[in-house]
Structures are given as structure tokens and as C-alpha cells.
């Protein structure tokens, strides 16, 4: 049985690190014919936001990776409290009546300056029950066996054997004084109830796994296999952070720039995982076939970006490769949100630019002249061909007008007509094509000329060439 879960908290936009975690869980589930679970961990009421939750669902929808079961943590509070009660009944937790917020704090233990409150830990069960029955607020803390030799141990599927002494783990909170479960309790209760077999999550949670192993054992639940993923790092050596690195870590940024979902999945999958055959461009089906936890690296993965180029060079290369491999009709549909034309026109344009774009949004700069009636201003010197002058350019364009007025307006017909015209003028074909290209596109670098002329149509081409003649 292979059951895995992705459990985001709706407290911010979908981070590319979170997206990678989802991808690895999804690939693992599909590779083993298992179950993929989406669980929204929304018990931190003060930090949750509808916008964040929308971002998560929008991002996952864009990736196009499905899930089999869906849950919301806040709807499972009775389950969390039942586990807390069971652990308390076994004597493996105690009530902490420390006033104000001190009893809720888990930060002090993380700093290594606090392990437990002796007065609360040693309170008799009778006294604890009496104070609780009287309505005195309390936090519930796990009773870590500090008086025992030994350690919490488990084998991580990525990082290997792990151990932490009992004396190095604080009595962490299970319930806050308002009765709400902490992250540790809610996650363990849900993972146990949902029969999660493997917890695949970021390496930043590795330190939490010791506490979670204690909870699973105390509750009499089977501990899932842990597999912690290497961190995603920025070029500056810092962990990728929403706060520090901004939009570059948001899935939305990649979507809006024009990454294909399959290329983005391919890129993220290679940040910390290596397929056996060392190939880089992979289809979704190939990734499912090849994915194993054994292929995950321990070394942190770097996402390379700069202020000038916000996207990793490998991400851009992979996106371009996936764009080139797509059927032109499918690519045309992907390009539609970025252009002001209908599908019929985009189907004509796409084969001309498919080899020239790295991002879907590049269509706006590579093919902009298809989308306007009037070209933006350009320097008339651009019309002059190599080893030519303005007079040659003008003669070429006048001849082109005559030829295009009657030529068969197809790729092959236009090529035959313009090559014949260059021969008549006694010039090289390139000297004929260059002025025509600039006249109809507004620049020297453009998609293949004859296909471009065909898509623009006779009327637009003649009008643009006529305007170019007036410039000379």
C-alpha cells in the first residue's frame, strides 16, 4: 500500500518548493499505483487566507497533476483531540497551566533553552484533572522521557539513519490553550487516520520527524516512512524564500511568464532527483516510470537566477525543448492567452515561431507584427540590404510590389516569384529578401519570410511595402 499526501497551509502563494513536493509525491504515488491525497492544513486560523488557498488550487490545476482524495484539516478537529486524549490517558502527555502565552510557546524549545516546566510536568493527575474541570486554561504537552537513556530513531529514505537523544527534545505542545491542535499533533493524527505510508516533504521538516515519531509511537500508530527532500537554494546560498526572493519563488510567476506545465514539472523534478538514465527532457509518463525515492539526492539543489534573468537557464532550455516537441496545434492553444488573435490565425502563425521561443510570452515579441495593422516606427536604414544602398532597396521593394500583386500567395508560390524577381534585378536572393522582410515585419530578424508573407496576406504585405518605399 502506497498512500502519500501533500499538505499545504493556506498562508501564502504556492512556492516552487511546495510544488516540487507535490510533484515528488504524485510521481511516487503514480509509479507505485498508489493513492495521492491533498489535505489543506488550515488549523492556523490566524494566518490562513482565502487568497492563499485559491493560489494553491490554481497552481495545482495549472500543473495538471490530479489527486485521489481530498481533506481539510480544520474539519477533523475531533480526531486530533481524540489522539491527544489517548496520549494523555496513557500518561505520555500532561497539562501545562502556565499563564498567558508561555504554555503555548514551542519556540523556546527550538532555541535549545527550555525542555520542560518541572512544576507542570510533575503535577499529579488528580490535581491536573481538578484544575481542568474548574475551567482553567491549559496547553497539552508531550511528556518526552528525559529521564531515559537513548534516543528517538528512524530511517529516512533519503538521509538514512537518524537519531536524537531524548534529552535534546523539549516537551512540545500538542494542544494550545485555546484547544486547537498544534502542527505536530494535527499532522500525526491525520497521517495515522489516512493510513499514510510515506511522508515525503522538505528537509526543513526533518527536525520535526523526531517529535512525530514520538507521537505515532505514543498513539500506538504505525509510523510512516519518512523521506525528506533536499532544500531549494538561491544562488546567494540562502534557502529560497518568499520573503527574501519574492515572486521568483512563486509558481504563478512561471505560469504567467509562459512556462508549459509539463516543462515546469520536468524542471522541478530534476531539482534533487536524478533519473537512472541521466536524461533531462522527460515526459510525464517517463518521469512516472523512472521515479524512485532512491534517486533523490541529499545535496541541496540550486535554482539559478539573476536580477536580469529571473529564470534558471535549465528551466528555459527545458521549456524551449518541450515547446519544440509539441504538436503545433496544441502549442497554438497554449499561446492564445498571450495574443490578440483567434485560434485560426494562431494555427497559421505557430509553425513559423515554434523554434524561436523559449517562453509562451515570447510570442508577443517574436510575432508582434502579426497582431498589428500598423507597424511601429523603424529606421529606414534597416531596409538597405548587405552591399546595397537606398536606391537598391527602393528598386527591390517596387519590384516586390509588382510581383506580390499577382503571385500565387502560398509559401511555395511566393518563394518562386521572389527568387525570379531577384534574378531579373541581377541581385542575390538575400538582397531581395532582406528589404521585403524588414518592410513587412519592421525588423531584420523575423520568422521564415515566405510563411510570414502567406500568413499576413496580400493586402497587408502590399500596404507595408508601400509604406516602406515612402521611407526611402
UniProtKB/Swiss-Prot annotation:
Organism lineage string: Bacteria, Pseudomonadati, Acidobacteriota, Terriglobia, Bryobacterales
Subcellular localization: Cytoplasm
Reactions performed catalytically: tRNA(Glu) + L-glutamate + ATP = L-glutamyl-tRNA(Glu) + AMP + diphosphate
A single Gene Ontology CC term: cytosol
Motif ('HIGH' region): 8-18
Species, as recorded: Solibacter usitatus (strain Ellin6076)
Any one GO molecular function term: glutamate-tRNA ligase activity
'KMSKS' region (motif): residue ranges: 239-243
Enzyme's top EC category: ligase
Pfam family, one: Anticodon_2
Name under which the protein is recorded: Glutamate--tRNA ligase
Keyword set, alphabetical order: Aminoacyl-tRNA synthetase, ATP-binding, Cytoplasm, Ligase, Nucleotide-binding, Protein biosynthesis
InterPro entries linked: aa-tRNA-synth_I_cd-bd (IPR045462), aa-tRNA-synth_I_codon-bd_sub2 (IPR020751), aa_tRNA-synth_I_cd-bd_sf (IPR008925), Glu-tRNA-ligase_bac/mito (IPR004527), Glu/Gln-tRNA-synth (IPR000924), Glu/Gln-tRNA-synth_Ib_cat-dom (IPR020058), GluQ/Sye (IPR049940), GluRS_core (IPR033910)
Amino acid at each position: 500500500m502506497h498512500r502519500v499526501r501533500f499538505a499545504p497551509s493556506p498562508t501564502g502563494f504556492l512556492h516552487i518548493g511546495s510544488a516540487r513536493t507535490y510533484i515528488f509525491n504524485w510521481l511516487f504515488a503514480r509509479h507505485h499505483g498508489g493513492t495521492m491525497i491533498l489535505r489543506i492544513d488550515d488549523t492556523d486560523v490566524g494566518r490562513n487566507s482565502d487568497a492563499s488557498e485559491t493560489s494553491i488550487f490554481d497552481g495545482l490545476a495549472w500543473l495538471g497533476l490530479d489527486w485521489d482524495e481530498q481533506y481539510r484539516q480544520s474539519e477533523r478537529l475531533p480526531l486530533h483531540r481524540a489522539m491527544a486524549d489517548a496520549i494523555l490517558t496513557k500518561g505520555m502527555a500532561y497539562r501545562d497551566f502556565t499563564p498567558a502565552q508561555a504554555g503555548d510557546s514551542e519556540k523556546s524549545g527550538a532555541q535549545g533553552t527550555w525542555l520542560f516546566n518541572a512544576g507542570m510536568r510533575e503535577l499529579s493527575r488528580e490535581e491536573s484533572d481538578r484544575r481542568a474541570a474548574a475551567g482553567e486554561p491549559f496547553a497539552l504537552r508531550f511528556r518526552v522521557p528525559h529521564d531515559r537513556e537513548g534516543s528517538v530513531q528512524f530511517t529516512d529514505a533519503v538521509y538514512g539513519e537518524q537519531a536524537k537523544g531524548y534529552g535534546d527534545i523539549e516537551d512540545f505542545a500538542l494542544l494550545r490553550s485555546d484547544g486547537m491542535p498544534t502542527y505536530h499533533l494535527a499532522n500525526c493524527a491525520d497521517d495515522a487516520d489516512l493510513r499514510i505510508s510515506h511522508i515525503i516533504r522538505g528537509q526543513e521538516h526533518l527536525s520535526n520527524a523526531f517529535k512525530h515519531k514520538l507521537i505515532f509511537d505514543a498513539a500506538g500508530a504505525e509510523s510512516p516512512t519518512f523521506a525528506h527532500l533536499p532544500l531549494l537554494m538561491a544562488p546567494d546560498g540562502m534557502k529560497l524564500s518568499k520573503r527574501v526572493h519574492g515572486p521568483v519563488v512563486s509558481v504563478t510567476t512561471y505560469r504567467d511568464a509562459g512556462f508549459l506545465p509539463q516543462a515546469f514539472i520536468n524542471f522541478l523534478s530534476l531539482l534533487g532527483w536524478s533519473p537512472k538514465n541521466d536524461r533531462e527532457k522527460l515526459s510525464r509518463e517517463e518521469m512516472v516510470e523512472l521515479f524512485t525515492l532512491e534517486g533523490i539526492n541529499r545535496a541541496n539543489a540550486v535554482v539559478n537566477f539573476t536580477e536580469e534573468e529571473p529564470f534558471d537557464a535549465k528551466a528555459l532550455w527545458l521549456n524551449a525543448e518541450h515547446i519544440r516537441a509539441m504538436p503545433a496545434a496544441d502549442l497554438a492553444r497554449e499561446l492564445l492567452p498571450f495574443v490578440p488573435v483567434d485560434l485560426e490565425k494562431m494555427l497559421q502563425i505557430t509553425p513559423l515561431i515554434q523554434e524561436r521561443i523559449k517562453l509562451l510570452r515570447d510570442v508577443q515579441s517574436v510575432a508582434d507584427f502579426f497582431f498589428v495593422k500598423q507597424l511601429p516606427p523603424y529606421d529606414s536604414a534597416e531596409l538597405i540590404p548587405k552591399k546595397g544602398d537606398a536606391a537598391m532597396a527602393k528598386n527591390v521593394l517596387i519590384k516586390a510590389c509588382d510581383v506580390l500583386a499577382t503571385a500565387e500567395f502560398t509559401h511555395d508560390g511566393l518563394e518562386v516569384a521572389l527568387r525570379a524577381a531577384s534574378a531579373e534585378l541581377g541581385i542575390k536572393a538575400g538582397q531581395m529578401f532582406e528589404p521585403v522582410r524588414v518592410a513587412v515585419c519592421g525588423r531584420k530578424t523575423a520568422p521564415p519570410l515566405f510563411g510570414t508573407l502567406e500568413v499576413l496576406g496580400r493586402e497587408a504585405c502590399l500596404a507595408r511595402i508601400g509604406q516602406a518605399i515612402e521611407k526611402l
